[in-house]
UniProtKB/Swiss-Prot annotation:
Top-level lineage group: Eukaryota
GO MF annotation list: transmembrane transporter activity
Gene Ontology cellular component terms for the protein in this record: fungal-type vacuole membrane
Keywords: Membrane, Transmembrane, Transmembrane helix, Transport, Vacuole
Segments passing through the bilayer: 34-54, 68-88, 94-114, 124-144, 156-175, 196-216, 262-282, 302-324, 335-355, 359-379, 403-423, 463-483
Pfam families, sorted: MFS_1 (PF07690)
Protein name per the record: Probable transporter MCH1
SUPFAM superfamilies in the record: MFS general substrate transporter (SSF103473)
Annotated family: Belongs to the major facilitator superfamily.
Physiological role: Probable transporter.
Places the protein is found: Vacuole membrane
Length: 489
């Protein structure tokens, strides 16, 4: 399928330069390397827990206001992904790299201005919405670049950028400890945000180059198919616009089949119930550590979470390929195992099983399950619906985290403000256990959803969707009722 006119315009000069000086094999390695480096730097939003103490004590934000900012971040990260995925499939990932350049630097510049001038938290929420969208665009560019360049190794081509993205929070937590980013013993958010503004501007430009290699690869394959192996790599640019929009109708027909597949919605609902609590934990990790184990360092818990998230992303990607290739074991069983691990993690938090010096166990389990979810879900989707519409398919699934993380985050903020107290020096017991006890219901529904997605006929899947939606409505009602009762007491 030919390059679209937009993709041709964005990559024409870069393709000419790269094809003149590099072989196809070298270009693939270059693109993959740049993509992985981009992922290593892309996870600044995962450091939100390190911003929380400053927002609370210096800007005097409540936990509910902080969760509004976190919700805007999640909405910016996940809600535009269906559109970003569609644009990437039709016009190449290079378009997403351009979007990341346009959103990242202005977003962090606005955030730095808000912090410096003590503007309303709504401006900070808007800035993090832009940052969230830019993060997804940059990360999705790298993910699609690797997946489309090396489509045969599904697990590794997805787990490698996903692993680097998880590792980025570990690197970031160490970088933010530098003395130049500290002020009076606390993190200087103004300097931090300005640093990110400059970093992501140049990183987006490099990602633009790496994404252009995908266009080169597809253009070369197209010409070989049409004209044979002896067709030169460089041709008249005016010829590139002929029949350059046939990708859109072909993509549309495949995407319609994806939308009509009942398994799409079963898996989508499962994702909503799994990523929501995980994203809520990351957003509120700083406050959660303070409430449950005040003596622990937030940066250390973020680092532990990042390490085990990275190990999960790397190991599960390779393990899924190994099990499918050698033992024909479905990736869905690995996914179900990670969901069960998340179930026990919620139990441990709710019952304060590991507190004080043992809280690192909670961070490790949470990080491993979080990384596993973001590795296995896209791998399963890639395996079922293929690389042609992977951008649109995975992007459509990201509606679920946008809804789930916002819902669970708001609930946590309400419970924390009413039960824990934002400015309390210490707390007794686990004042947020209510949130995690209620989340056990969502994970239980999620396990049944994945199980029925692997087995069962079409009628069972349809009935399961209806039942699960009714349970989810009941679940939201119970949360609202319990919050109301806790405020009265």
């Amino acid at each position: 399928m030919a390059l679209s006119s937009i993709e041709t315009a964005l990559t024409k000069h870069i393709r000419s330069l790269l094809q003149t000086h590099f072989s196809t094999k070298s270009l693939k390695r270059l693109a993959c390397s740049i993509s992985l480096i981009s992922c290593l730097c892309a996870g600044s939003v995962l450091l939100f827990a390190l911003f929380t103490p400053v927002l609370q004590h210096q800007l005097h934000y409540t936990q509910f206001q902080i969760n509004i900012i976190g919700s805007f971040t999640s909405i910016g990260m996940y809600l535009p992904l269906p559109v970003l995925g569609y644009l990437a499939d039709c016009h190449g990932p290079v378009l997403l790299s351009v979007i990341s350049v346009l959103f990242f630097s202005p977003g962090y510049t606005l955030a730095a201005t808000v912090v410096q001038n003590d503007w309303s938290f709504w401006y900070l929420a808007i800035s993090f919405g832009l940052i969230g969208c830019a993060t997804s665009a940059l990360y999705f560019t790298a993910l699609l670049t690797c997946a489309k360049i090396y489509p045969k190794s599904k697990g590794l081509t997805i787990s490698a950028p996903v692993t680097c993205y998880g590792l980025s929070s570990l690197i970031g937590s160490r970088v933010l400890k530098l003395s130049c980013l500290q002020k009076n013993g606390d993190l200087d958010l103004y300097r931090c945000f300005k640093l990110f503004s400059f970093l992501y501007f140049f990183l987006g430009l490099f990602d633009w180059v790496s994404a252009s290699v995908v266009s080169i690869e597809r253009d070369v394959l197209l010409r070989k198919h049409e004209d044979g192996e002896n067709t030169p790599l460089l041709t008249d640019p005016n010829q590139e616009h002929e029949n350059n929009d046939d990708l859109v109708p072909n993509h549309k027909s495949k995407f319609l089949k994806f939308i009509k597949d009942i398994s799409t919605y079963v898996l989508l609902f499962s994702l909503l119930l799994s990523i929501g609590p995980s994203e809520m934990y990351i957003t509120n990790m700083g406050s959660l550590v303070k409430a449950i184990t005040p003596n622990s360092l937030i940066s250390d818990q973020v680092a532990i979470h990042a390490v085990f998230s990275t190990l999960s992303r790397l190991s599960l990607g390779a393990l899924s390929d190994f099990l499918v290739t050698n033992y024909q074991i479905s990736r869905s069983w690995l996914l179900l195992s990670i969901i069960v691990l998340g179930f026990f993690t919620q139990i441990f938090i709710a019952t304060s099983t590991f507190v004080k010096d043992q809280y690192y166990i909670i961070s490790a389990l949470s990080g491993f399950s979080y990384g596993g979810l973001f590795t296995l879900y896209p791998t399963v989707i890639f395996s079922i619906w293929g690389p042609e519409i992977f951008g649109s398919a995975w992007g459509s699934f990201m509606i679920a985290p946008a809804i789930g993380s916002t819902t669970f985050g708001m609930v946590f903020g309400l419970v924390y403000d009413s039960a824990c107290g934002v400015f309390a020096e210490s707390t007794t017991g686990n004042c947020v256990s209510l949130v995690f006890l209620d989340q056990l219901l969502s994970i239980r529904l999620q396990c049944s959803t994945v199980t029925h997605c692997m087995e069962g006929d079409l009628d069972q899947k349809r009935s399961l969707i209806i039942i699960n939606h009714l349970h989810y409505i009941k679940y939201i009602y119970l949360l609202i009722l319990r919050i109301h009762l806790s405020r009265e007491t």
